[in-house]
Amino acid sequence: MPTINQLVRKPRQSKIKKSTSPALNKGLNSFKRELTDVNSPQKRGVCTRVGTMTPKKPNSALRKYARVRLSNGIEVTAYIPGIGHNLQEHSVVLIRGGRVKDLPGVRYHIVRGALDTAGVENRGQSRSKYGTKKPKK
């Protein structure tokens, strides 16, 4: 336990909070061709690869993912939520933060119903999260 005098001389250091989605915290200065610190809630990107991967140990499935080159030049792996999708190479997508716990290295989600990504078909509940329009009566 430090004394008051020790704390006056050298105060406690505050913890540095590390971002869970670092690619959303960078913007591209196209004049200087360098990354700048600009926080954004979502970013646009182009799919460079679409595929499936298997989750970590206790779980078993084929999870859909896309490798996305963002508008700031960073390439990330993003999860495609919902049942079925229409994404392929060169599709323009919107990504948001949010990791997938059982897929290592996947720190982003693709926003369904935005840009080239279609919403989930015949979805009744939680429609806003999957970009599905309200069904006609």
Curated annotation (Swiss-Prot):
Residues 1-26 are annotated as: Disordered. It comes from the Bacteria. Keywords: Ribonucleoprotein, Ribosomal protein, RNA-binding, rRNA-binding, tRNA-binding. One of its GO terms (biological process) is translation. CDD domains: Ribosomal_S12. SUPFAM superfamilies: Nucleic acid-binding proteins. One of its GO terms (cellular component) is small ribosomal subunit. GO terms for molecular function: rRNA binding; structural constituent of ribosome; tRNA binding. InterPro entries: NA-bd_OB-fold, Ribosomal_uS12, Ribosomal_uS12_bac. Residues 9-18 have a biased composition (Basic residues). Part of the 30S ribosomal subunit. Contacts proteins S8 and S17. May interact with IF1 in the 30S initiation complex. Belongs to the universal ribosomal protein uS12 family. With S4 and S5 plays an important role in translational accuracy. This is Small ribosomal subunit protein uS12. It comes from Listeria monocytogenes serovar 1/2a (strain ATCC BAA-679 / EGD-e).
